[in-house]
A protein has these predicted regions:
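Active-site acidic/histidine proton-transfer and metal-coordination neighborhood
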Residues: 17-119, 129
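Short acidic, glycine/proline-enriched helix-loop-strand junctions
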Residues: 1-4, 85
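A generic structural signal for well-ordered alpha-helical segments
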Residues: 1-2, 41, 80, 177
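Histidine-acidic metal/acid-base catalytic patches
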Residues: 45-47, 100-122, 127-215
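Short active-site-adjacent helix-start/loop capping segments
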Residues: 6-7, 14-18, 196
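Hydrophobic residues within beta-strands of alpha/beta enzymes
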Residues: 6-8, 49-50, 87, 150, ...
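Active-site-proximal loop/turn and secondary-structure-junction residues that shape catalytic pockets
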Residues: 11-14, 53-57, 91-95, 124-128, ...
Length: 215
């Protein structure tokens, strides 16, 4: 069908993956995990891969966890740079981590690592659930040059729903991306269990929503 992978996403929520874990062996295993998946992305002819800080322990000092994450990403980025793969760092919600879940934290991490291979990812669901940034302020703080990928889904405010099934202002989000001249892909990260038994219908309705607005 001549399909191409727009952005490769290794599993990192179910598996024990975290660059902000206090155990160095755990972090080293995570670095190795991401480095091997960079190789997989290259094999799949995909130049973009999603990464995250993973789950963070709430009783660990935030600055320590930030340093562990920055050091780990510095190692991962060396591999990404050599393979020509851009890493799209996705913030998680405030219920998952306190290391990277808003635009200012994401930008700080990008600047600390300082690699051209490390960029940011904007997720409409995560941004709304965290409740610190609006989609517009998130993109504005991050900067167009640092935005590698977007997860574009609906929610109440969370839920990862088909566009139109939630109450997020996705039309405004599209206008924001237009205003920032975003040229990348929009990823449909549809995760709610209501779609499990009939995923084809969910995809058809999502495509119809996009077709009405993007053509």
């Amino acid at each position: 069908h001549h399909l191409k992978i727009a952005c490769f996403t290794p599993e990192q929520c179910v598996y024990p993956i975290s660059v902000s874990h206090p155990d160095k062996r755990y972090r080293d295993r995570t670095v190795d995990f991401f480095q091997r998946h960079i190789e997989a992305a290259v094999c799949l002819d995909c130049s973009c891969m999603v990464v995250s800080t993973g789950f963070a322990y709430l009783d660990v000092d935030g600055e320590d966890a930030f340093k562990w994450a920055a050091d780990s990403f510095s190692q991962i980025c060396r591999k990404a740079e050599s393979e020509g793969v851009t890493l799209a760092l996705e913030p998680f919600t405030k219920y998952t981590t306190h290391i990277c879940n808003e635009a200012s934290q994401l930008l700080r991490l990008l600047r600390t690592v300082g690699s051209p291979a490390l960029k940011g990812l904007g997720d409409t669901d995560v941004i709304a659930t965290t409740g610190v940034d609006t989609f517009e302020t998130f993109i504005g703080i991050l900067g167009r040059e640092n935005l590698a990928h977007v997860h574009f889904v609906d929610g109440n405010p969370g839920g990862h729903l088909v566009p139109g099934d939630g109450n997020l202002n996705l039309d405004q989000a599209l206008h924001t991306l237009e205003a920032f001249d975003y040229k990348g892909y929009l990823g449909l990260e549809i995760l709610d269990r209501r779609y499990v038994m009939n995923p084809e219908d969910a995809m058809r309705r999502a495509l119809a929503w996009y077709s009405e607005r993007i053509g």
